């Protein structure tokens, strides 16, 4: 992370964080993949985050630190599955299923994340999951980080064509 990027973030007792929320046009929501929210989080101490039944897909990368992600995948009839997360790991979740994540006390994590949706998002997720696990490592980790950072920057000061970027 660039120092300038990090310095913009809000600090609490639990996290340093920055996120952008995007409200795309009705046309964009109907026709394209679109960003709903993207951000950066640095845990200062361990805390649990739990979500379910969101109309969204979440992709996040672990920049540093470690934690645990637990997930009930909607495409599966199984129960909750857990995975330990370390720097360099990637996660891709269908947020209509329940998920939790918590960083460790000993090595709090730093994440970049993006929530997105669109008319073909389910098909994209299903295709991805047919070929990969929801927790994985990518040979293109640096490019993924750069892409998410760019999305955050583009959406911090939206213009008329931000939806299309």
Predicted region positions:
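Alpha-helix N-cap/helix-start motif at coil-to-helix transitions, marked by capping-box chemistry
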Residues: 29-32, 115, 138-145
């Amino acid at each position: 992370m660039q120092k300038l990027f990090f310095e913009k973030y809000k600090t609490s007792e639990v996290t340093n964080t920055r996120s952008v929320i995007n409200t795309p046009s009705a046309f964009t929501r109907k026709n394209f993949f679109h960003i709903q929210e993207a951000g950066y989080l640095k845990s200062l101490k361990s805390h649990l985050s739990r979500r379910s039944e969101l109309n969204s897909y979440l992709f996040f990368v672990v920049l540093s630190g470690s934690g645990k992600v637990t997930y009930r995948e909607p495409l599966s009839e199984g129960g909750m599955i857990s995975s330990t997360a370390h720097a360099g790991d990637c996660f891709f979740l269908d947020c209509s299923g329940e998920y939790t994540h918590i960083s460790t006390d000993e090595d709090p994590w730093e994440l970049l994340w993006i929530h997105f949706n669109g008319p073909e998002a389910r098909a994209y997720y299903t295709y991805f999951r047919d070929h990969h696990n929801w927790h994985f490592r990518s040979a293109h980790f640096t490019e993924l980080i750069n892409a998410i950072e760019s999305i955050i920057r583009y959406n911090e000061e939206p213009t008329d064509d931000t939806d299309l970027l």
